Amino acid sequence: MSRVSQARSLGKYFLLVDNMLVVLGFFVVFPLISIRFVDQMGWAALMVGIALGLRQLVQQGLGIFGGAIADRFGAKPMIVTGMLMRAGGFAAMAVAHEPWVLWFSCILSGLGGTLFDPPRAALVVKLVRPHQRGRFFSILMMQDSAGAVIGALLGSWLLQYDFRLVCSAGAALFIACAAFNAWYLPAWKLSTVKTPIREGLGRVLRDKRFVTYVLTLTGYYMLAVQVMLMLPIMVNDIAGSPAAVKWMYAIEATISLTLLYPIARWSEKRFRLEHRLMAGLLVMTLAMLPIGMTSSLQQLFTLICLFYIGSIIAEPARETLGASLADARARGSYMGFSRLGLAFGGALGYAGGGWLFDAGKAVGQPERPWLMLGAIGVITFLALWWQFSPKRSASGMLEPRT
């Protein structure tokens, strides 16, 4: 085995360990924020939605700058600093008794993610060969699902005693992850050339094909982020206990671990990436439309199963498609900008979803937010269909800029 092949192989194992620590640290805390502050402390869902939206907007919206800085200075210092900032955000969240403290903690957590997320994504593109990326993204997502369940189980158990223990566990995991990266991550450069920050930013912004794709995904993410806000609240409301939320993540893990990789392997040989993304989005949309009209936990979990099936169809294709459109001369900048759709979609999905949930509850129309999200899913599906239509591909709109 050549030194390059050996480095790629060891790098992939490093990425898997790193990813598990990050996923555990995140899911110990974030799925329980809505339970803690809406159900236990009686805050309006809008207040919590704003907090979650701020974290999403800061982390993903500023990701292009984090990626551009990583292109210039390398991955390691950005990742270690960002993970320590995320731990600090969790520490602040532990003492949040006013909305502004929760907002501050989420902003700090988001700033940490701004620093570590784009270089981590760029390392995947650097270390995994193009023909292997779809399968590797599938493995990462299976790991995400397993980590989500373990994290949510740990967080739910700790929440019975004290929310401060939940935040402490999350902070400890991110500190451990920072130490792991500081000790084991080589001083790798992300791009094929040492790209100045301004040049990396400009290269992305001139790529009309990539910019259009990223912004189109805003609607997709408005649906996807509800696993952190409205779905846990719905499960808790119908079940009458926050302990039921862990079963939602158990469903996700079961579906992901049993179906994600086989579906990805089967579909990558038969369908184009954009068609897989659109098919998954359509399934997610159909699952969301009737959620507000469900009255039993069995019905709700059935729809959640369908939603997760759509997600595992779409997610590997979305990640692989984004990576395939990136320019190797500015990987960090591209991976940072690719998070902008999640920034906008997350902020709108959290804040808008929280507001719609409160408004629907106040007027006795609990189905309102879910119907609105379903409409957004349909619009996004049509936008993707338009973007990847044969006529637009033939016109050069989807061709790389030179």
From Swiss-Prot:
Record flagged with keyword DNA-binding: no
Membrane topology note: Multi-pass membrane protein
Asked whether the keyword Cell inner membrane is assigned, the reply is: yes
InterPro entries in the record: MFS, MFS_dom, MFS_trans_sf, MFS_Transporters, Multidrug-R_MdtH
Q: Which GO terms describe its cellular component?
A: plasma membrane
Membrane spanning residue stretches: 13-33, 34-54, 99-116, 139-159, 165-185, 214-234, 243-263, 277-297, 300-320, 340-360, 369-389
Annotated compartments: Cell inner membrane
- MF terms per GO, please? transmembrane transporter activity
Keywords, ordered alphabetically: Cell inner membrane, Cell membrane, Membrane, Transmembrane, Transmembrane helix, Transport
State the similarity comment: Belongs to the major facilitator superfamily. DHA1 family. MdtH (TC 2.A.1.2.21) subfamily.
Q: Which HAMAP family match?
A: MFS_MdtH (MF_01529)
For this entry, the protein name equals: Multidrug resistance protein MdtH
Species this chain originates from? Klebsiella pneumoniae subsp. pneumoniae (strain ATCC 700721 / MGH 78578)
State the gene name recorded for this protein: mdtH
